[in-house]
Amino acid sequence: MTAPTIPRSHPRYRSLMVRSDLAEKMAEGLVVPEGLMAHGRGEAFDYLLGEKTTPEAAKAERAAAAHLLLARHPVLSVNGNVAALAAAEVASLSKSLPRLTVEVNLFHRTPDRARRVADALRQAGVPTVLGEHPTARLRGLASDRAWVDAHGILRADVVVVPLEDGDRAEALVRAGKFVISVDLNPLSRTSQKAQLPIVDELTRALRHIDLGILRMRRWEPSRISTVAQSVEAPEVLSSALRRIRVRLDRLAAPEPRRGSPRRAG
Ligand code: PTJ
């Protein structure tokens, strides 16, 4: 099947290109069909949030950068969608923070998919990728997401889990990890369970975290710690929901009739 030509002038050019790329990567076996559904859900929330990083998400991304800088064993967990959408951003982040371990973790795990995800990351420039041949299991999880590397997620103190499912986020918290999620849905169980939920689109979030790391990496730990402590999870989630509500209220307000006085605000 050949991909359709998408004119650059199309108002949704970027979104259509991303979809076409994901569809191709599904045909190659990197992304699972369920990943396309997950992407559609993410897009819907991005629409509701205005398709840009909100000030609250930017603050959470700065805090995430601070947590990663302070962590002893920071790990970034990568699934099929993350590798397909953001391999370059993952590579850039691992360059900015060489201590960051990148680990493949799949819900729909097969040895072939684990290898494809690891290959995509290596091709993008990630020097070392764990999780292809997992060596341990996370307690209290029945799914294949429980498979982890003993030198990666199992010993991590801080774990970034983009596009995660709620069960594993919960299991990671139970295992004593500090969990940073990236999920456009503020209502998802993952966002609700993470100690630091980032409600933003994946590539935007990873770029902002990267910039935060570059900006703060020579700071005193106490100053970095102040940034890390500056964000409360419940406030991140309620501010995202308030933003959606205010935006919808504004958009749903009836157009003023010609000749009628304009509404204030
Ligand atoms: O590659 P695998 O086998 O590990 O499977 C990956 C998927 C994504 C299929 C699996 O983790 C899954 O089913 O995820 P969920 O439970 O659908 O959750 C994905 C969440 O990510 C949803 O809440 C979406 O709103 C959100 N999401 C999707 N795309 C983006 C996103 N959030 C931020 N940026 C995106 N680009």
Language-model-derived ranges and their functions:
Residues 62, 83-101:
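Histidine-anchored nucleotide/phosphate-binding helix
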Residues 8-66, 113-120:
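Short, compositionally biased "basic patch" segments
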Residues 166-187:
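A short, gly/pro- and small-residue-rich
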Residues 93-146:
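Long, charge-dense
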Residues 79-88, 108-112, 164-167:
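Gly/Ser/Thr-rich loops at beta-strand to alpha-helix junctions
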Residues 72-79, 101-105:
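Short glycine-rich or small-residue beta-strand-to-loop segments that form or flank ligand, phosphate
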Residues 135-154, 160-167:
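Active-site glycine-rich loop that binds ribose-phosphate moieties when present
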Residues 189-265:
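C-terminal functional extensions of proteins
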